[in-house]
């Protein structure tokens, strides 16, 4: 691999090429399990570039009659080299209120592209496709196959990537094109959802001493659980209720958020079908490497049993992972050595594309999980990388999603370089 060869590839990624595909993608609404039109657009584009394209039908994990589709583009190598998957999702985040521009207008002004999915994650898919297109146009030959996989339903726990794996799609290496401010996330948190149900017999304002002794309002039971775990988004201190080893690249983690609490009352409209004797709490922990489902379950059981010893009326039921999240929002943390060839190749690509020193570590994806977690858990060494930085917003998900075109172009060139270096 010579400098002239890689310079020739990088030069074939142009602002106009990236902007045109990015704007076309933003203008196609593609909410989760409604990605068919954008899937067809990307499939046709990749086919025109010269990739072999297969369309994979994906069934909704909770609604068997609902289906969507995702393309698998393959640039076939000559053989004898490692294969690389470029993975990004076609479904953007939640469309929040408060947009000041048309979320599907793909406005381009002052170097910024605006719209739903501008960097989460249509921009990532666009950068991947444009990077591979540059390799094809350069005439370079690769030994290993390159798979370009725009997937559906990331926002449904990575259902599209899980469907890829179930379909037998594999690669030796993968880059998950998630927004990371063009930093290389070789380490990322994981996620596990936890469900706790508390119970108590109903008690009215006139009662016996025995009945009162056996009663603890289920909401108040949940309040005690919340108190002992601590405030949402506060770092969980080492040596406390949760067992873990802090990771130097994931400061402030593990941490958690309390997501939902449900309690019914027999005199009020029932929204959940639950009995008024019970209260449900759902919360999530963003985990660090080394933590396991079994370890977290043991920690939670110890915390809850501690409450029971102090309050005999405490009555709980614990599920980890929460029912319905086992094959979605239950993802292991990932940690790839900085010396891994995937990391070093992409770092050199970022250096060449940007002219600046690359940043490797957890910073750009701090707190996020991506489909890269799923790929890595399936045995495919993966990093997460892409344009866009959610720290520029006051909230996330957000209105007015936007990304600098220059960052998308840099990402496309960095990926083109890494792909050529790894697969040539």
Predicted features along the sequence, with ranges:
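Acidic/His- and Gly-rich active-site-bordering loop/insert found
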Residues: 2-114, 137, 141-142
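Metal-dependent amide/peptide-bond hydrolase catalytic core
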Residues: 1-4, 199-424
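Short glycine-aspartate micro-motif
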Residues: 83-85, 113, 170-176, 193-195, ...
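Phosphate-handling active-site elements
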Residues: 97-98, 109-111, 131-147, 232-239, ...
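Fold-level recognition of mixed alpha/beta catalytic cores in primary-metabolism enzymes, strongest
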Residues: 119, 123-231, 399-416
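Short, solvent-exposed loop/turn segments at the edges of secondary structure
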Residues: 68, 101, 189-193, 274-278
């Amino acid at each position: 691999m010579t400098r002239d060869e890689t310079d020739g590839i990088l030069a074939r990624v142009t602002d106009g090429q990236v902007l045109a595909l990015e704007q076309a993608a933003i203008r196609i609404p593609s909410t989760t399990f409604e990605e068919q039109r954008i899937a067809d657009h990307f499939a046709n584009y990749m086919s025109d570039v010269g990739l072999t394209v297969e369309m994979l039908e994906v069934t909704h994990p909770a609604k068997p009659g609902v289906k969507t589709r995702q393309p698998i583009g393959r640039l076939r190598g000559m053989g004898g080299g490692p294969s690389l998957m470029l993975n990004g999702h076609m479904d953007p985040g939640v469309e929040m209120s408060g947009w000041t521009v048309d979320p599907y207008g793909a406005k381009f002004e002052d170097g910024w592209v605006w719209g739903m999915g501008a960097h989460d994650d249509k921009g990532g898919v666009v950068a991947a496709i444009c990077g591979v297109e540059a390799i094809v146009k350069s005439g370079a030959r690769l030994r290993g196959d390159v798979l370009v996989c725009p997937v559906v339903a990331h926002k449904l726990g990575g259902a599209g990537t899980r469907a890829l794996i179930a379909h037998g799609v594999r690669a030796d290496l993968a880059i998950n094109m998630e927004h990371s401010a063009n930093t290389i996330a070789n380490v990322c948190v994981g996620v596990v959802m936890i469900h706790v149900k508390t119970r108590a017999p109903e008690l009215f304002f006139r009662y016996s001493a025995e009945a009162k002794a056996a009663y603890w309002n289920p909401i108040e039971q949940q309040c005690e659980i919340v108190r002992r775990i601590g405030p949402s988004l506060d770092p969980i201190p080492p040596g406390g209720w949760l067992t873990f080893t802090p990771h130097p690249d994931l400061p402030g983690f593990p941490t958690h958020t309390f997501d939902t609490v449900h309690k019914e009352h027999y005199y009020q409209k029932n929204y959940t079908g639950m009995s008024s004797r019970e209260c449900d709490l759902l919360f999530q922990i963003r985990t660090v490497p080394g933590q396991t489902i079994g370890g977290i379950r043991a920690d939670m059981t110890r915390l809850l049993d501690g409450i029971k010893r102090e309050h005999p009326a405490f009555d709980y039921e614990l599920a980890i992972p929460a029912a319905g999240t086992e094959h979605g929002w239950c993802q292991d943390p990932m940690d790839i050595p900085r010396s891994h060839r995937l990391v070093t190749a992409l770092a050199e690509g970022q250096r060449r594309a940007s002219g600046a020193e690359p940043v490797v570590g957890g910073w750009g994806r701090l707190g996020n999980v991506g489909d890269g977690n799923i790929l890595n858990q399936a045995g495919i060494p993966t990093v997460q990388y892409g344009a866009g930085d959610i720290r520029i917003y006051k909230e996330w998900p957000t209105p007015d999603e936007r990304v600098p075109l220059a960052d998308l172009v840099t990402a496309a060139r960095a990926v083109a370089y890494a792909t050529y270096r790894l697969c040539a």
